[in-house]
């Protein structure tokens, strides 16, 4: 589903990852992170896809909201598990969306 974002400007966090073979607890944690993100101030929506690489784009009102999400206690735990057992590599990019269009 394509996220229904407001009129720009707003911010996008692009999380690109490659997975390890380990799956233990991943699906549950992924579901929990979506639920938790949706409760955070400034969260606007997200889009996600996975094949050989995974790409999740989450949308946020401002940079402070992104910082607060990054430092959320449960999210910090998920980040730790991701580094230790679920991801063989990842990259995070933060962008300001100045224009969007579509139908």
Which ranges hold each PLM region?
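Short S/T/G/P-rich N-terminal loop/turn motif that feeds into the first structured element of a domain
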Residues: 1-54, 63-71, 87-103
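Sensory beta-strand/linker motifs that couple input domains to effectors
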Residues: 59
């Amino acid at each position: 589903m394509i996220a229904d974002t407001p009129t720009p400007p707003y911010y996008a966090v692009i999380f690109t990852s490659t997975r390890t073979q380990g799956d233990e607890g991943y699906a549950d944690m992924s579901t929990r992170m979506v639920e938790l993100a949706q409760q955070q101030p400034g969260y606007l929506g997200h889009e996600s896809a996975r094949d050989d690489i995974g790409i999740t784009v989450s949308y946020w009102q401002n940079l402070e909201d992104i910082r607060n999400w990054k430092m959320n206690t449960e999210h910090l735990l998920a980040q730790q598990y991701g580094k230790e057992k679920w991801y063989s590599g990842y990259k995070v990019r933060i962008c300001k969306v100045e224009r969007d269009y579509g139908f």
